[in-house]
Design a protein with these regions (language model features):
Chain B
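Hinge/lid segment of periplasmic solute-binding proteins
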Residues: 81, 106-160, 215-216, 305-308
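Conserved C-terminal helix/tail region of periplasmic/extracytoplasmic solute-binding proteins
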Residues: 74, 78, 170, 355, ...
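Short, solvent-exposed loop/beta-turn-alpha elements that line the ligand-binding surface or hinge
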Residues: 122-135, 179-180, 202, 223-250, ...
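Glycine-centered hinge/linker elements that transmit conformational signals in sensory
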Residues: 188-193, 234-268
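A structural signal for short loop-to-beta-strand junctions that line the ligand-binding cleft
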Residues: 101, 130-169, 316-323, 393-400
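Extracytoplasmic/periplasmic solute-binding protein
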Residues: 144-155, 160, 185-238, 283
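Extracytoplasmic/periplasmic substrate-recognition and gating elements
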Residues: 261, 298-363
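Conserved N-terminal structural module of periplasmic/extracytoplasmic solute-binding proteins
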Residues: 19-111, 115, 129, 176-177, ...
């Protein structure tokens, strides 16, 4: 690494630094505006707050808007989706990656094809279907919708990753008497954990931030997710933007936490040798 | 054997008595539960309320009052995050048979399109309501005075106007409180005077909201002065042509000339900060509806004025008016189990007492003829009182007259005419093509 | 057991039982996936396909009209513009992949401050598209900061109305998508790099390869499968999930100049709350589906590496 030109290194570092600043700017924007009064925001959205800092936006969010309750709903949906997604995906991807059977390519491609369907189109038939199943306004409707949406992409990711697992490891495990579940537990999951952690990050955050699906399927006030509730704060004619920013900032926290916890593990796999 | 027999008899007795008690429970007055969808931000629930806990909102308290007056009834409030999507949701829920008993939707074509899943209220609306509430034409199918009643106009009214900055106008040598521009020529020269002192006359985000703001709030009035609402209806139903509508073409031509003369900001179709600019004195006028008055008055104080649109055609039958009216409605789903109770609730929300209570929180010109501005506590001559004068003489929202085909073109492409990317005739022809395909 | 070959295993009774167990494993592993997708994806899309040949208004009107929806839509003056927009926006994919690789390499090599960068790069993905769209719109607005900077450095002639014209608006949107996606690309690639044994790198160093040679000749070929994933996933995202961004930034405008097929589906089915045009909306969705399939097939053919999928 020392052999690379210092100039090159400095330029790259500088670019990364600039990039980092731009990445953080939206959070900064929401922060300064969440501390302003509504009229002050309309007058200048980019200045630092001039009047008294409106911490009430945050206290309102917690005590009166009951954002923690909304977190609970979002969490049930996001965590439920991720857990089920992992369970279904790991086994399916393992089979796609390491087993040979007739029709494997066909089924794999068929699964992938469902990825290409935009969700706006399936939402109405799904609503009618869930209505007949009595699942409207239950978490299951959103979880199942997300599962159907995320499965193909997650399988694509995990299969790509699992294929890199060295066959000899699996054979060795089988020779040692490991059954199917044990092979998954002792070989596939540890070796494929990059893809697993990536999936946890992607799909938890995608589900957490999604507006469209829960807006349609979870309408009762006590089951609304955070993003849906916050969207109701801005209409075409009126709105409470500063309050909304406080809420958005607060709801970014769990997503960031999930990311920070799991992203360390993705790179940790670097130094761990594969052949023990 | 005898024991067994006695035992069985006892058991049967027990079961019978339990069954009888249970069935008599069902005979008592059944609990009535109504689900109500409310617009989250643009209607009865205002921005200031969502800062309070839900049970302190005006609408929640109104519900409690209703429940108290009608024991056995519970109301479940559902806030719709996106009013546009609410219509599609209502439609889908209606298809599935579980649309909410009462829903707060828009008026006009949006609910006409849903009439297959909306309950007709012809036989259910009390006569007093028909008498004292304004705006029924907006909820009657086809806007006909005898059309099926599809809902109630919601208890508030938006009136279109232009907010203006008195200080800038004064600097340009005018006083619009004493002498507002009332003809299109006066308006034109007034804007030119403002431009002459170096201030952008009209700041507006013409496309940022997906709706051409200036055109919808102001120019639509000019259009309907010449063509009348009925004329526009004929065109949207395909019986007449937009391309032959002289009023429409003339309005569009003037709209384009306003841009050419520099009366609009240059980035008309891509801007999204016009309200901010207006509040900072960088623009003289900003087209608005009543909801924005409070924020504008807070920022500009005494410098905040309201200007009603000038007359494009002084010989028109429609004068001294502006676009507005009940843009929101309350509808009842066809699949409701309690139609009378649903109507009773809506009637309650529109009652004089409730309207007065609601207005304490959200100021709008109101839809009842038996409420005076004094009762509302509005100072005569104040901006809100000025707007209130139009609460019975408004001209119903022109863009809600359009059916979805022409509406799609109108909403997405009208702003292009201002910047010259499309000619008025091209816009009209595109709308005709859609109207014909319906 | 350890001395018998696979073939004899298969032939014996134990071998046949093994095969049966394996078949069961395959079946049960794939069953949940197939079921979920059939019920919640295939069934709705088949319904949608059927509806695309009708004049369905979302409610009870549903008369067969054959290919009319498709024909009308393709014949609308805006169809080719929309198609063009959709394809131009796809240019973001190679850009984000390239930058993503560079960033991933830098993080892998632990450039100064890498921990901070790694923690921060995913942030845009966590922020709602509405805020991102709003900020980009202001930033590149006619009177916004970007133009102000251009004027300040004397490039005033370039300070145009970025969102006012099709190509420049699309350019800004591509830029914003790349900005938004760098973090995602980088961690996907890092994830892929984590399964490359360090011995490969060590061997390369011994062989005397310098940094860039190591990076591009060795690492990238090993990442092919991961890159294939990220290219397909970002391509599909651009084609089917871009809607919130477009809505926040341009609303598909001016006019239809930045509308895509994905956006048109929204407009036709939800547009302003009373879209009656579900028949056309589903037809557009079918057209989009065909487009995506076509592009993916092309991509897979181009990336035809030797592996046992073919």
């Amino acid at each position: 690494m020392a052999r690379r030109g210092i100039a090159k290194q400095v330029t790259l570092s500088l670019l990364l630094a600039i990039l980092t600043v731009t990445f953080l700017y939206p959070l900064y924007f929401m922060l300064i505006n969440s501390l302003k009064s509504r009229t002050e925001y309309f007058v200048n959205p980019f200045s630092l707050p001039r009047g008294a800092l409106q911490f009430e936006n945050y206290s309102t969010m917690i005590s009166q808007f009951k954002i923690l309750n909304l977190f609970k709903n979002s969490f049930f949906v996001s965590a439920g989706t991720v857990v089920l997604l992992l369970v279904v995906c790991v086994f399916a991807s393992y089979v796609f990656a390491k087993y040979r059977f007739r029709g494997r390519t066909a089924i794999y491609l068929a699964v992938l094809t469902t990825m290409f369907i935009p969700s706006q189109v399936t939402i109405i038939p799904l609503y009618v279907l869930f209505s007949k199943m009595g699942l409207v306004n239950r978490y299951w409707s959103v979880i199942l919708s997300y599962l159907a949406l995320f499965l193909p992409e997650a399988i694509l990711l995990m299969t790509a990753n699992f294929r890199a697992i060295i066959d000899e490891l699996l054979e060795a495990a089988e020779m040692d008497g490991c059954g199917y579940f044990q092979r998954v537990r002792h070989v596939v999951v540890p070796m494929g954990r990059a893809a697993i952690f990536l999936s946890i990050i992607f799909y938890f955050i995608t589900a957490w931030n999604d507006l469209f699906t829960p807006m349609i399927f979870l309408q009762s006030m006590d089951k609304r997710t955070v993003m849906v509730a916050l969207a109701a704060l801005m209409g075409r004619y009126t709105g409470a933007p500063t309050l909304q920013f406080a809420g958005l900032l607060l709801s970014a926290v769990p997503a960031l936490v999930v990311y920070i916890i799991f992203q360390r593990h993705i790179i940790r796999g670097l130094s761990v040798g594969a052949i023990k | 054997m005898k024991r067994l027999f006695t035992f069985s008899l006892l058991l049967v007795f027990l079961l019978a008595s339990v069954a009888i008690t249970l069935s008599s429970c069902g005979g008592k007055k059944e609990a009535v539960k109504l689900t109500v969808w409310m617009n989250g931000a643009d209607s009865i629930i205002g921005p200031t309320e969502q800062q309070k806990p839900q049970d302190q909102w005006y609408v929640s308290q109104a519900f409690r009052r209703f429940e108290k007056a009608n024991p056995g009834v519970t109301l479940e409030l559902v806030v719709q995050a996106d009013q546009g999507a609410a219509h599609t949701n209502f439609k889908t829920a209606g298809l599935a048979g579980n649309a909410p008993d009462v829903a707060n939707l828009w008026t006009g074509q949006p609910i006409f399109a849903l009439k297959e899943v909306i309950l007709s209220l012809d036989k259910l609306v009390p006569a007093d309501d028909l008498k004292y509430i304004v705006g029924w034409e907006s909820v009657r199918d086809g806007f006909k005075p005898d059309g099926t009643i599809l809902g109630y106009p919601a208890a508030q009214n938006q009136i279109c106007h232009m907010l203006y900055n008195k200080a800038i106008v004064k600097k340009a040598g005018m006083d619009w409180e004493a002498n507002p521009p009332r003809t299109i020529e006066e308006f034109d020269s007034a804007l030119a005077k403002i431009k002459a002192i170096g201030v952008t006359p009209i700041v507006v985000d013409e496309a940022a909201q997906g709706v051409p703001w200036f055109f919808c709030w102001v120019a639509d009035y000019w259009w309907t002065q010449m063509t009348t609402n009925d004329g526009i209806l004929e065109e949207t139903y395909g019986r007449k042509k937009f391309a032959e509508d002289k009023g429409f073409l003339a309005t569009l031509a003037y709209y384009r000339s306003m841009y050419v003369k520099g009366f609009f900001r240059k980035d008309l179709t891509t801007a999204n900060d016009s309200f901010t600019q207006f509040l900072n004195g960088k623009g003289a006028l900003w087209p608005a509806v009543t909801s924005f008055l409070a924020d504008a008055e807070k920022s500009l104080g005494a410098d905040c004025g309201v200007l009603l649109p000038p007359e494009f055609d002084p010989n028109a039958k429609l004068v001294n008016s502006t676009v507005g009216g009940p843009g929101q409605s309350f509808v009842v789903a066809k699949n409701t189990k309690y139609p009378q109770m649903a109507v009773k609730l809506i009637s309650f929300l529109n009652s004089k007492a409730e309207v007065l209570a609601a207005q304490k929180i959200n100021r709008y010109p109101i839809v009842r003829t038996d409420v005076t501005p004094e009762e509302m506590g509005w100072v005569p001559g104040s901006n809100i009182a000025k707007l209130h004068k139009y609460s019975t003489t408004y001209n119903y929202w022109v863009d809600n007259l359009l059916t979805s085909g022409p509406a799609e073109i109108f909403y997405t492409q009208t702003s292009l005419v201002a910047v010259g990317k499309m000619t008025p005739l091209q816009l009209a022809e595109a709308m005709d093509k859609k109207a014909a395909a319906q | 057991m350890t001395h018998t070959t696979r073939a004899s295993l298969r032939d014996s009774a134990i071998g046949r039982k093994r095969t049966r167990i394996k078949r069961l494993e395959i079946f049960l592993s794939l069953l949940p996936v197939v079921l979920i997708l059939l019920v919640f994806r295939v069934y709705p899309i088949v319904t949608a396909l059927a509806k695309s040949f009708t004049n369905w208004d979302g409610l009870y009107r549903s008369d067969w009209v054959g290919l009319r929806n498709y024909v009308t839509f393709v014949q609308e003056g805006t169809f080719w513009m929309i198609l063009r927009n959709t394809l131009i926006l796809l240019l973001n994919v190679p850009l984000q992949v390239f930058i993503g690789i560079v960033v991933a390499l830098l993080l892998y090599e632990r450039v100064a401050g890498w921990r901070i960068y790694r923690a921060v790069i995913y942030t845009p993905q966590i922020i709602s598209a509405v805020i991102i769209g709003f900020l980009f719109k202001i930033f590149f607005g006619f009177e916004g900061p970007f133009n102000a900077v251009l004027k300040a450095v004397g490039l005033g002639t370039l300070a145009i109305e970025w969102f006012g014209n099709s190509y420049t608006a699309l350019g800004v949107i591509v830029f914003s998508i790349v900005w938004f996606s760098i973090g995602w690309q980088a961690i996907v690639i890092l994830g892929g790099m984590s399964s490359i044994p360090p011995s490969v790198f060590e061997a390369a160093v011994i062989d005397g390869a310098n940094y860039w040679q190591r990076a591009f000749r060795i690492v990238i070929p090993m990442l092919v499968r991961v890159l294939e994933f990220s290219i397909i996933a970002s391509g599909v995202w651009t084609l089917t999930q871009l809607f919130p961004f477009l809505f926040a930034m341009t609303k598909g405008g001016p006019g239809y100049e930045t509308s895509t097929l994905d956006y048109m589906i929204y407009l036709k089915s939800y547009g302003l709350g009373f879209g009656r045009d579900y028949g056309t909306a589903t037809a557009v969705a079918m057209i989009l589906l065909l487009l995506v399939l076509a592009l993916t097939v092309i991509e897979m053919r181009l990336a035809n590496r030797a592996d046992d999928w073919g």
